[in-house]
């Protein structure tokens, strides 16, 4: 489960997906199981991250700067903190959120947000301490990441004692192939903000490069999976590997044009394990392995914005392919931004329409 490491590390986690060199035709069959949906929160304004906390609340961010907790049993929303420094510009603002894996003894909260720095739009990752119902003692872990009204990445995942951060190209295509730039990367830090000694380059926070706008990140089966927005083609699901190049902007999706094939060979490019053309705008990503909805066991769940659909990607027993893909909620709630999964197996999705956004609970009928 995304950003719920105290539960995630206990699960038998697996993932891999079907590789179709021509891309998906987006004509997947309808959902293979009947799902009931109910709204547990409404009147939100662009929620961006939702995650299940150890207090049985859904912790969530809203792009304008709010961090809150939702009790899904009652619908009660409790404000945690509004960060005045946050500047919401286009798709920028208050974005990713993660909780320390040992939250009961180390109540730390990690957030990503965009702000103005001497007239420049920038992004930072800050660690807070949760105490007395609010967040205190901010510590900046990494700063001066270029931000933009689009392509900010900003998903967080804590794996063991390391913090992974996805960054977009911030509309500057020169950055992803430059390993000394922080944009267009998956970054990896220690939880105190220092650079791990076993990163690909000493003193450099990058873990992988050549990314356009990865907005989904989940750890499963000792692998880190990402969902990444393509341009007008080739949204991607990737497996993130240490020090590897994922091709952007020289490669879009698979290495299947003459120019791409040469670049891929010369630069040892990692191809996506799934790609969609036309695009569906892949965003939040999570892993499902609960008995509540047995048809979804061993699946990746992907929230999509443009397609306004929740995708279930069923993984094979060998974890090297997708056996089938199912679609849920198509157009029912509009754009879907993120997903979280409760220990009970219930699934929650948040919308990204603005003004009257909702968090929706999914359960088996």
Located regions from the model:
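Beta-propeller blade signature
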Residues: 123-132, 179-191, 239-241
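Short edge-strand/loop segments of extracellular domains
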Residues: 231-246, 305
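Repeat-solenoid scaffold signature
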Residues: 206-236
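Bacterial Sec-dependent N-terminal signal peptides
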Residues: 9-36
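Surface-exposed loop and turn segments in beta-propeller and other repeat-based domains
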Residues: 78-92, 138-152, 191-208, 248-277, ...
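Bacterial N-terminal signal peptides that target proteins for export
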Residues: 1-8
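Conserved blade-ending motifs and adjacent loop-strand segments that build the rim/top face
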Residues: 320-343
